[in-house]
């Protein structure tokens, strides 16, 4: 699904959340993190006992999958509540946790925010309830996003491996018949496209760290690390990161790549009117683009990202989320079974993938003909799902997040994002971001490696 990272919580909200570390999470009748494995008898009893669960999620039409769960387990009544997206969603979760009342049982949780809630002991470790047995059902790198040191903090629901959506007609006017295979070819194509058509080969948004981090992910960069306790690693201004951003600075300063904020009217228009000849985006992008630039149907094609070396096939990820269970739940078994079932039952996961167009993290869906064999008219009949399914297998599994990514995203806009918007020194922007992140970590009591 489209990531909700453009507008996140400010530093004060993050600091308040970190203070919750000193709070004791409610055991909730088995909601603690050190529970013995639930026996099958206990699971059967929990699922056959009249129970009310509350599920906070922004996912459109997720009631469809919840209805399937309730048909399977009629004694479980699930109330689906949309309390907002992005900052509103996470702030309300934190407020409910701090107040020790009104918190839901199950919550939608983007991967980059799991560490911050795990730090405050707000998430139930699902491993004792059987989640550790699900690892083989998911792509390796996805499972790493929800697990740490044997604990499992969420059940993956959707992901966003990166690819390249491009206008075949615009590139064709520049004499380009295939998507650039390498970043060197991409830069050459950018010159040709601008000269022949006036279009930008793509746009690099100054307000969206998610896209930049995905590109760094593809480049093998490891900007963050977290030991699960009080030690973090911050390395956003490494030589490799500066090399990658130097590439983009060159294209920006030569006016070959635009720098419009994304998910704005100006940006939507650019996708629809040919200002941008392409969009480096995630697997949720193809369907999103159809709704944004519908009149350009048939003109777009999809490809993997350009590579740093010929013959390579490596990608990064942008977006996606899981379903997590709060540690305060009074019904941990039923809550876990809800999160597990809607993201593992084949009827449910196929519905997510083929009707709501969430890009799947489950191996069996990524191989299912009902999903991968779909031909997309918008992309000239191309099997776009098949392409992105293949790309999903090329994402590096070793990518971590800071336990204060709320501040990570907002400080990006004040540093790297500002440099992009001003078409300035992106290396200096990375240095400033590094300083902001390390200073914040120290102020919050973290040890910085």
Positions of the model-derived regions?
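Alpha-to-beta junction loops
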Residues: 97-109, 124, 198-200, 273-282
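Conserved N-terminal structural module of periplasmic/extracytoplasmic solute-binding proteins
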Residues: 2-11, 15-16, 20-115, 134, ...
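Glycine-centered hinge/linker elements that transmit conformational signals in sensory
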Residues: 190, 230-261, 305
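Hinge/lid segment of periplasmic solute-binding proteins
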Residues: 37-42, 111-162, 215, 301-303, ...
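A structural signal for short loop-to-beta-strand junctions that line the ligand-binding cleft
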Residues: 103-105, 133-171, 201, 312-316, ...
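C-terminal lobe and pocket-closing loops
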Residues: 47, 284-296, 309-411, 444, ...
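Extracytoplasmic/periplasmic solute-binding protein
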Residues: 153-157, 162, 184-233, 240, ...
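Short helix-initiation/N-cap motifs at beta->coil->alpha
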Residues: 82-93, 112, 183-188, 260-273
């Amino acid at each position: 699904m489209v990531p909700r990272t453009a507008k996140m919580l400010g530093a004060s909200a993050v600091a308040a959340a970190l203070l919750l570390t000193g709070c004791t999470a409610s055991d909730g009748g088995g909601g603690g993190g050190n529970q013995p494995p639930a026996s099958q008898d206990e699971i059967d009893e929990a699922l056959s006992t009249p129970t009310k669960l509350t599920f906070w999620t922004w996912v459109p039409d997720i009631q469809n999958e919840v209805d399937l769960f309730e048909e399977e387990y009629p004694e479980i009544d699930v109330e689906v509540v949309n309390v907002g997206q992005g900052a509103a969603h996470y702030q309300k979760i934190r407020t409910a946790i701090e107040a020790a009342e009104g918190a839901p049982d199950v919550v939608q949780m983007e991967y980059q925010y799991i560490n911050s809630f795990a730090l405050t002991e707000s998430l139930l470790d699902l491993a004792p309830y059987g989640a550790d047995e699900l690892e083989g059902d998911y792509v390796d790198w996805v499972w790493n996003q929800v697990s740490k040191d044997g604990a499992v903090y969420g059940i993956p629901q959707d992901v966003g491996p990166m690819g390249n959506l491009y206008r075949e007609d615009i590139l064709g006017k520049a004499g380009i018949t295939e998507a650039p295979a390498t970043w060197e070819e991409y830069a050459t194509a950018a010159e040709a496209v601008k000269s022949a058509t006036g279009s930008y080969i793509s746009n690099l948004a100054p307000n969206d760290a998610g896209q930049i981090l995905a590109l760094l992910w593809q480049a093998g960069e490891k900007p963050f690390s977290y030991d699960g306790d009080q030690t973090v690693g911050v390395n956003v201004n490494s030589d490799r990161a500066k090399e990658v951003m130097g590439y983009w600075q060159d294209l920006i300063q030569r006016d070959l790549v635009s720098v419009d904020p994304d998910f704005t009217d100006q940006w939507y228009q650019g996708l629809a009117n040919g200002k941008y000849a392409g969009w480096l985006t995630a697997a949720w992008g193809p369907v999103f683009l159809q709704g944004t630039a519908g009149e350009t149907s048939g003109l777009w094609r999809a490809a993997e990202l350009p590579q740093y070396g010929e013959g390579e096939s490596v990608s990064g990820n942008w977006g996606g989320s899981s379903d997590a269970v709060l540690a305060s739940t009074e019904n941990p078994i039923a809550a876990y079974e809800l999160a597990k079932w809607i993201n593992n039952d084949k009827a449910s996961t196929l519905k997510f993938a083929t009707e709501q167009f969430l890009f799947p993290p489950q191996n069996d869906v990524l191989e299912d003909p009902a999903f991968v064999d779909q031909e997309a008219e918008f992309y000239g009949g191309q099997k776009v799902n098949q392409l992105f399914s293949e790309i999903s297998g090329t994402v590096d599994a070793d990518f971590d997040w800071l336990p204060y990514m709320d501040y990570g995203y907002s400080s990006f806009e004040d540093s790297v994002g500002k440099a992009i918007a001003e078409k300035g020194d992106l290396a200096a922007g990375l240095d400033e971001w590094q300083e902001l992140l390390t200073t914040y970590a120290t102020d919050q009591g973290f040890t910085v490696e």
